[in-house]
């Protein structure tokens, strides 16, 4: 075995470990993002030291210099950063934190990509179990889509109940009509992940109570926030990766009857047969024909 401490790199073509990249995080790494030029790797998570040096929940590495830790980039998030994205000179961050560099920031913040200084971009999440799990910037750099378990952003719960579009320059909440349909937040539900392309944004969700959260599955909306399609296959859905023609999701789906797919089946043990992932067509031609089983939300 080759020791690694919460982060590693491997070659895509072979799967072989990259021996020269071995920073040590003293807590979990949760998100990665590259600078526009591909020279700087940003790593977020629940750590306060990297290679024995103080770096609080966000660090940067110089890939043009063998992945060396960039000591000068040292923003101080008071606790976990769960998701990040980088555009130009700005690193956007979401998580469970309450302050950045000593300044109040409730779950959402932006810092300078070189210095780590706190930027004026300020949006505040609130509610029971308020956290941000997914954050991505639109390809044109004008909007930020965020998802999580928060019940409001800047005091707004529609949009803002687990999902919202924000202005990338001002952090002002933008019209997100899909949030009138997709409602996942609170103690028993969340939007777990978001992804983007030129045509819109994608999200995934889980629900333990349809009174607080109504989708287990994935969805796509356009950049005006209008719903394009959704697949309510029953089972927590964790991440999403879109291409032009397909969408890949990781989950534990057990019934896709809602869109004419497989029904619940049981293993010889009697337990439900959960899938670990699905591939879907990236198309609005999805017909939701039945509610499915076990009292799930009826789309």
Regions found by a protein language model. Name each.
Residues 1-299:
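Extracytoplasmic surface signature
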């Amino acid at each position: 075995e080759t020791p690694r401490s919460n982060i590693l790199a491997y070659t895509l073509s072979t799967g072989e470990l990259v021996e020269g990249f071995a920073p040590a995080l003293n807590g979990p790494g949760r998100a990665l993002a590259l600078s526009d030029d591909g020279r700087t790797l940003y790593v977020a998570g629940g750590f306060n030291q990297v290679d024995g040096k103080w770096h609080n929940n966000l660090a940067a590495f110089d890939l043009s210099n063998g992945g060396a830790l960039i000591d000068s980039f040292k923003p101080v998030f008071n606790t976990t950063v769960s998701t990040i994205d980088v555009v130009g000179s700005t690193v956007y961050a979401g998580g469970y934190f309450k302050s950045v560099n000593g300044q109040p920031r409730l779950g959402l913040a932006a810092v300078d990509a070189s210095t780590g200084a706190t930027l004026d971009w300020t949006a505040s999440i609130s509610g029971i179990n308020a956290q941000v799990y997914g954050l991505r910037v639109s390809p044109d750099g004008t909007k930020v889509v965020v998802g999580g378990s928060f019940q409001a952003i800047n005091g707004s719960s529609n949009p803002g109940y687990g999902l919202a579009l924000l202005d990338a320059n001002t952090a002002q909440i933008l019209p997100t009509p899909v949030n009138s349909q997709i409602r996942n937040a609170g103690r028993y539900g969340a939007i777990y992940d978001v992804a983007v392309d030129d045509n819109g944004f994608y999200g995934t969700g889980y629900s333990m109570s349809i009174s607080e959260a109504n989708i287990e599955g994935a969805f796509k909306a356009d950049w005006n926030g209008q719903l394009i399609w959704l697949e309510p296959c029953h089972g927590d859905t964790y991440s999403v990766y879109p291409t032009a023609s397909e969408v890949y999701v990781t989950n534990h789906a057990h019934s896709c009857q809602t869109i004419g797919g497989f029904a619940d089946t049981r293993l010889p043990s009697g337990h439900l047969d959960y899938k670990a992932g699905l591939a879907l067509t990236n198309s609005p031609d999805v017909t939701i024909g039945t509610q499915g089983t076990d009292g799930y939300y009826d789309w």
